[in-house]
């Protein structure tokens, strides 16, 4: 009997604004028709994808939904799936939300994030005695402020949490958020020591490992993918290290076997947007 998967961490409401183009500083752009509100964040995106893929797969959500209309919306949307257990979702504070600016021309997105209650989510908010799953997936490192805090023994509180999940017999899986700055090596690296599955994009991998994967000219350095994946394993990833990007997806298992697949060639206009694409991968 399948024990299932727990998706923990960020529970967010995304408000997506389609824009004509990304403006320069002090310039204006138009928001076009099609403003949408949807659930977002690692928990909501990943768990709803899994629920669609296998309606019989037991799923558990762990995170915070605020005492507000947005929190009601999150629970209502996830409650549509009979195989998602919401008993470990706590109502606390204000629901996190993200204003997503989606460029109509390039389909690229830019995110403006309000942490809300997510800022306080931590190890003690998980009912470890009742949690009985095969895989514990958490995201996002760099967007869960309490778990990003330092820990004298483990480096970060996130690393401590992941080790606890492993000691409880679960395989661990992590995701990170894309951001500018120098926090990747400091916050992601400690977590990798207690990670079985690491699935992140090329820019996040580059900032974590220091291996050049995409230059300032936008060119993808496919020839460096294997070295980057090897580095993730050296940093502690136990089972699968996976990198996804628009052009390809590639991975390396615990035995050093390297796999690479090109993206599907789809008709122009087929892809309506890329919000949640990384979680879906």
Regions found by a protein language model. Name each.
Residues 37-44, 68, 152-155, 222, ...:
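Electropositive phosphate-/nucleotide-binding environments in soluble metabolic enzymes
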Residues 1-80, 121, 267-274:
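Glycine-rich phosphate/adenosyl-contacting loop at the front of the ribokinase-like
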Residues 93-96:
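Short, basic and Ser/Thr-rich N-terminal targeting/leader segments
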Residues 64, 98-101:
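Catalytic-core segment of enzymes that process non-peptidic bonds
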Residues 47-48, 206-210, 271-281:
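Short, small-residue alpha-helix embedded
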Residues 1-16, 72-91, 101-271:
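Ribokinase/PfkB-type carbohydrate-kinase core domain
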């Amino acid at each position: 009997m399948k024990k299932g998967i727990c998706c923990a961490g960020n529970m967010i409401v995304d408000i997506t604004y389609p824009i004509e183009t990304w403006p320069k500083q002090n310039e204006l752009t138009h928001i076009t028709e099609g403003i949408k509100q949807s659930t977002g964040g690692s928990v909501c995106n990943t768990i709803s994808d899994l629920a669609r893929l296998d309606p019989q797969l037991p799923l558990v959500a762990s995170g915070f939904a605020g005492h507000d209309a947005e929190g009601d919306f999150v629970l209502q949307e996830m409650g549509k799936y009979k195989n998602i257990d919401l008993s470990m979702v706590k109502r606390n504070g204000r629901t996190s939300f993200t204003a997503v600016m989606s460029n109509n021309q390039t389909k690229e997105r830019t995110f403006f994030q309000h942490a809300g209650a997510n800022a306080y989510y931590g190890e003690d908010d998980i009912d470890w005695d009742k949690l009985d799953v095969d895989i514990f997936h958490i995201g996002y490192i760099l967007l869960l402020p309490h778990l990003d805090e330092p820990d004298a023994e483990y480096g970060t509180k996130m690393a401590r949490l992941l080790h606890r999940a492993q000691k409880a017999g679960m395989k661990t899986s992590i995701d990170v958020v894309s951001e500018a700055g120098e926090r990747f090596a400091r916050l992601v690296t400690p977590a990798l020591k207690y990670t079985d599955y690491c699935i992140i994009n090329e820019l996040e991998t580059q900032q974590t490992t220091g291996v050049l994967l995409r230059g300032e000219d936008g060119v993808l350095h496919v020839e460096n993918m294997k070295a980057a994946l090897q580095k993730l394993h050296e940093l502690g990833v136990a089972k699968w290290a996976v990198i996804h990007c628009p052009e390809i997806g590639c991975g390396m298992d615990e035995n050093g076997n390297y796999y690479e697949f090109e993206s599907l060639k789809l008709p122009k206009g087929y892809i309506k947007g890329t919000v949640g694409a990384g979680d879906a991968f």
